[in-house]
Amino acid sequence: LALTLSDEKTLITHAENAAKFLGYEIFVRKSNDTKRSKYGVLRRVFNKRIQLALGKDTFKKKLLEYRVLEIKIHNGKEYWKAKSRPKLSNNNDFEILDRYNKEIKGIYNYYCLANNCSSLSKLGYIMKYSMYKTFAQKYRTTMSQIRKKYTKNGLFSVRYYLKNGTTKDLTFYHGGFKKKN
């Protein structure tokens, strides 16, 4: 192909070490776990499989970018705490909830191929409590009062009106963070 490679951008990594690409960590799994085949023979089916993983730093950066995460260090250990987004307080309830839903779904749709994408549930938790705090700040009340006011059938939802006068409810994302194939 006669391609020229840039020394700054090119990084050759051993397959067992994770290579970071587009927010994913790509590596070859090294595992001695066995599974029986349909003929009853033990096989190492998980060994030498290419894995896509989601690093903790990846969604930590995203949460910091959205300004919903406050990191506190106590006794050398990192604690994550959700914080409100004052810039969204001027929006109506539908716009606030819709923004949070779009951000969560966007991140999940991008990282749903990762083998450990269920770790995004921590991101969902932080985003949910950030949303509670944003609503509480907007109405100058507590998170528990906001949850009581907006929770219907166990789901956080906001009622909004359409142009023809009918009402609909927009619920907070509750689709889970399962790996997609």
Annotate the PLM regions.
Residues 1-181:
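Non-catalytic terminal/accessory segments
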